Amino acid sequence: MKQLSNLFDMKKNSEKITMVTSYDYPSAKQAEAAEIDTILVGDSLGMTVLGYDSTVQVTLNDMIHHGKAVRRGAPNTFVVVDLPIGTVGISDEKDLENALRLYQETKANAVKAEGAHLISFITKASAMGIPVVSHLGLTPQSVGIMGYKMQGSTKEAAKQLISDAEAVQEAGAVMLVLEAVPSDLAALISERLDIPVIGIGAGKGTDGQVLVYHDMLNYGQEHRAKFVKQYGDFSNGIEALQQYHKEVREGDFPSEAYTYKKQILEELDK
């Protein structure tokens, strides 16, 4: 299994890290077969596979359910699972209880927490032996406040983002995800930090990149962000379903090629 130390070595050797956001067994199995370095089980599963309006409705049980499936599909890949909104920032006791449950039940390598306001949680979870990945910049759980826009785009905001990145590392974060940040700022933060920095919409100067499986394969997604490159196309699923519907209605499926041919009625008459 790929360990955290392998990811640190990759940063040290300037070898780019690949991360894919996956939510289920089949996609995780494909990611591992493709030798993707890390898998993120993001709370974006709420919109992508559960049909919610936002990540706000995603529960801890949702994350555990999907995290387990991903681990079964990718037993040898470094897996990070999101702590959904409402599971941290409550109290020290409850925060750690939720983090430990997610970490243990999914058999993840780390949990992810959004925002610099969770410094205390990162410190305490790390002390308990729970590796924490931090997420700064555009944080989906706060998008209702921030809006879907680039972060760190003013002098003051850039300084704050640098300070926050250094603070989460100091608190014990083992990795940082930077989302929707100016490329030069993301590169500077990656250079300053010792921990791996994974970018999404943050340019090529970070230590690695993350894209959502469904986005990069055009699988059920109506809109893609500017920073998403499409590497495949699963959008013809509707056409396939329409063809299936047509063939069944017209009696063309199943044909002989898809039918067990043993004749049993004669045996029943004996």
Curated annotation (Swiss-Prot):
Subcellular locations according to the entry: Cytoplasm
Cofactor detail note: Binds 1 Mg(2+) ion per subunit.
Annotated positions binding Mg(2+): D43, D82, E114
Pathway this chain belongs to: Cofactor biosynthesis; (R)-pantothenate biosynthesis; (R)-pantoate from 3-methyl-2-oxobutanoate: step 1/2
Catalyzed reactions: 3-methyl-2-oxobutanoate + (6R)-5,10-methylene-5,6,7,8-tetrahydrofolate + H2O = 2-dehydropantoate + (6S)-5,6,7,8-tetrahydrofolate
Keywords (A to Z) from UniProt: Cytoplasm, Magnesium, Metal-binding, Pantothenate biosynthesis, Transferase
Cofactors named for this entry: Mg(2+)
One MF term in the entry's GO annotations: magnesium ion binding
E.C. number: 2.1.2.11
Cellular component per GO, a single term: cytoplasm
Residues given in the record as 3-methyl-2-oxobutanoate binding sites: D43, S44, D82, K112
Active site residues per record: E179
Record's function text: Catalyzes the reversible reaction in which hydroxymethyl group from 5,10-methylenetetrahydrofolate is transferred onto alpha-ketoisovalerate to form ketopantoate.
Self-association state and partner proteins as the record states: Homodecamer; pentamer of dimers.
Official protein name in the record: 3-methyl-2-oxobutanoate hydroxymethyltransferase
Gene it is expressed from: panB
